[in-house]
């Protein structure tokens, strides 16, 4: 192959093409002087040389008129920054402007950066007394090591052969006294140590107040009477040692004429005034923590899940135990079925299908009847005989319901109707959220989540009549409950609970719940304490004998609280939440007014139910006599914790 030699003209063209298409890291620079300090050419008329060796003239600066015209014509003039390296202006983008603003405000230049990330405490605050692993020691830990035996043998042989020599004594360096050292090398005497130990720091000079300002407020300035009184008072009895004065600016303030006098008085105070040693308490921080009671003293309380009761195909919204019975409880769900369960073996005893989803179920508190009140989404409420349990009580309930007169007139607010087979129905006209009984068993109330007072009714079973107790309602209705012994009605809105005296038809007390949105309420069996749970995860204990505000508020759940229940005999309270947990508290109400109530969380019970639409556990109830807890779940299951 024959190669032609390129002449000088072709070689020049080729090199020019290569230079034109060659890329470099400095393509954004207008000149090609390289990455060198531009200050090298401050004394020259040029700023460097190009690739051909020609001088690059420095850019001419615009005069004031040209800069003014550029400022008026260019809308991005305020974004332009002069780049001395390239000799031109650079326009900043939005991100660079934000970084500059952040740096100017003493913030991080990275927009959106959060320097305060959540801290995860990986260490436990509880001191354990038992080891994590209690595995017994192996056999080889009691037998001498063979490797150590061989190593010792080699060392003995080396000593015998003279290969190992004893280490030479270290030469003691000459210690020179350091005159300017903070801690001298020589040990201090007892007198010096006592002087250091008994050193009392001097008290600090009090900070100046508003009266010592060069421009004090008008109330600190003295008028003629106060000035005359100050001059007549002895120097020892004066409240201030000086007369406050006002100046227009700081440069007009003269020198302080009492400076040397104040320094002299300070020296006299330090020299003559005795100092007192401040005793420090060396207390372990663990001793400052409150002593928690022993859990064994709080037993019994539910600890484990015994079994699940399955049968409902939707949400289980309400639970209720038969009065003075320890075997049967009722449940109502979204599937429109009313089920009666045996607590002993978890067997479903009876299932009744209704014409709507059930919102609430409540047994009549009278033990002589087996009467159930059920509210449904079909705008109806029924009073039905459970037909489960003691036969004598079932017969008594049927006879009582059949003798009731359900004759309705035009003046009646609601229409009562006897359906036969031990069932009464009331057409409410709205979806009732809950039904609650009075302790005597003749009155019960229903309400809906609304601001209208027309959706709150008190019903009388013996007369088959209903009435509206309120003509006006403040706030959105959320909960309702009767007083256990007095004719009082607890009406709960989002943030407040109002106690009404039904006998006198007047407001008795207004309670602040401490929650932003109350979801459930329980009044204790004496009526002196109210337990409140809210959608904002706050659980409050309100002692009505102490105050109308919460005595104790905790936030142990991570989701909204759906139910609060109290045990009839044991000092136990339980809350259930959408975080699939139920927390059991030991809550002993003190009968002595001088002794404080006891409130300690003892157990967190977890369920394996799946959440649906953010809901998990909807209701809970304690066994009447045993320390057992029953919870109703959104997936249709009912759990028993023992």
Curated annotation (Swiss-Prot):
SUPFAM superfamilies: WD40 repeat-like. The keyword rRNA-binding does not apply. InterPro entries: BOP1/Erb1 (IPR028598), BOP1_N_dom (IPR012953), WD40/YVTN_repeat-like_dom_sf (IPR015943), WD40_repeat_dom_sf (IPR036322), WD40_rpt (IPR001680). The keyword Zinc-finger does not apply. Keywords: Nucleus, Repeat, Ribosome biogenesis, rRNA processing, WD repeat. WD repeats lie at residues 311-351, 353-393, 472-510, 513-552, 556-595, 612-642. One of its GO terms (biological process) is maturation of 5.8S rRNA from tricistronic rRNA transcript (SSU-rRNA, 5.8S rRNA, LSU-rRNA). Belongs to the WD repeat BOP1/ERB1 family. This is Ribosome biogenesis protein BOP1 homolog. It comes from Brugia malayi (Filarial nematode worm).
């Amino acid at each position: 192959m024959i190669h032609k030699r390129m002449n000088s003209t072709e070689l020049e063209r080729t090199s020019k093409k290569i230079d034109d298409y060659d890329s470099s890291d400095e393509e954004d620079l207008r000149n090609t002087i390289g990455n060198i300090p531009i200050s090298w050419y401050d004394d020259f008329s040029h700023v460097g040389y190009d690739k051909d060796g020609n001088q690059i003239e420095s850019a001419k600066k615009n005069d004031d008129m040209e800069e003014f015209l550029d400022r008026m014509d260019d809308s991005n003039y305020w974004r332009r920054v002069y780049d001395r390296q390239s000799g031109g202006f650079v326009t900043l983008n939005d991100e660079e402007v934000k970084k500059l603003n952040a740096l100017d405000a003493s913030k991080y230049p990275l927009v959106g950066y959060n320097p305060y990330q959540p801290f995860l405490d990986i260490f436990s605050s509880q001191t354990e007394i038992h080891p994590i692993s209690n595995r017994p020691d192996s056999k080889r830990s009691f037998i001498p090591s063979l490797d150590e035996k061989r190593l010792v043998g080699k060392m003995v042989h080396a000593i015998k052969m003279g290969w190992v020599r004893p280490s030479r004594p270290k030469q003691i360096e000459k210690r020179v006294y350091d005159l300017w050292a903070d801690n001298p090398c020589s040990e201090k005497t007892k007198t010096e140590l006592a002087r250091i130990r008994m050193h009392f720091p001097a008290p600090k000079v009090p900070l100046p107040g508003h009266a010592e300002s060069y421009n004090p407020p008008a109330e600190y300035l003295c008028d003629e009477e106060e000035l005359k009184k100050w001059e007549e008072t002895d120097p020892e009895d004066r409240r201030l040692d000086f007369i406050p004065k006002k100046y227009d600016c700081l440069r007009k303030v003269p020198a302080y004429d009492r400076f040397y006098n104040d320094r002299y008085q300070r020296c006299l105070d330090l020299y003559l005034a005795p100092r007192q040693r401040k005793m420090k308490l060396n207390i372990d921080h663990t001793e400052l923590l409150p002593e928690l009671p022993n859990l064994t003293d709080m037993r019994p309380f539910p600890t484990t899940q015994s079994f699940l009761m399955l049968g409902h195909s939707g949400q289980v919204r309400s639970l209720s135990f038969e009065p003075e019975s320890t075997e049967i409880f009722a449940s109502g769900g979204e599937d429109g079925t009313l089920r009666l369960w045996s607590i002993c073996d978890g067997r479903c005893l009876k299932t009744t299908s209704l014409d709507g989803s059930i919102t609430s179920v409540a047994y009549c508190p009278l033990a002589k009847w087996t009467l159930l009140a059920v509210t449904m989404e079909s705008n109806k409420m029924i009073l039905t005989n459970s037909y489960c349990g003691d036969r004598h009580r079932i017969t008594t309930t049927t006879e009582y319901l059949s003798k009731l007169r359900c004759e309705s007139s035009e003046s009646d607010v609601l229409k009562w109707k006897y359906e036969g087979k031990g069932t009464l129905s009331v057409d409410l006209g709205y979806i009732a959220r809950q039904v609650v009984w009075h302790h005597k068993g003749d009155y019960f109330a229903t309400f809906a989540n609304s601001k209208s007072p027309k959706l709150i009714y008190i019903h009388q079973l013996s007369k088959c009549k209903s009435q509206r107790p309120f003509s006006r309602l403040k706030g959105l209705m959320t909960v309702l409950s009767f007083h256990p012994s007095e004719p009082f009605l607890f009406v709960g809105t989002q943030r407040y609970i109002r106690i009404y005296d039904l006998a006198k038809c007047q407001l008795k007390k207004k309670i602040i719940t401490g929650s932003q949105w109350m979801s459930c309420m329980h009044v204790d069996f004496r009526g002196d304490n109210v337990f409140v749970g809210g959608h904002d995860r706050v659980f409050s204990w309100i002692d009505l004998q102490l105050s109308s505000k919460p005595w104790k508020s905790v936030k142990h759940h991570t989701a909204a609280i759906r139910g609060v229940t109290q045990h009839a005999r044991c000092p136990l309270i339980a809350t259930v939440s959408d975080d699939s947990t139920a927390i059991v508290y030991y809550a002993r109400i003190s009968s002595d007014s001088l002794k404080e109530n006891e409130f300690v969380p003892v157990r967190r019970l977890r369920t394996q139910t799946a959440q649906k639409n953010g809901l998990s556990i909807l209701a809970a109830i304690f066994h009447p006599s045993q320390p057992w807890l029953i919870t109703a779940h959104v997936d249709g299951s009912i759990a028993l914790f023992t």
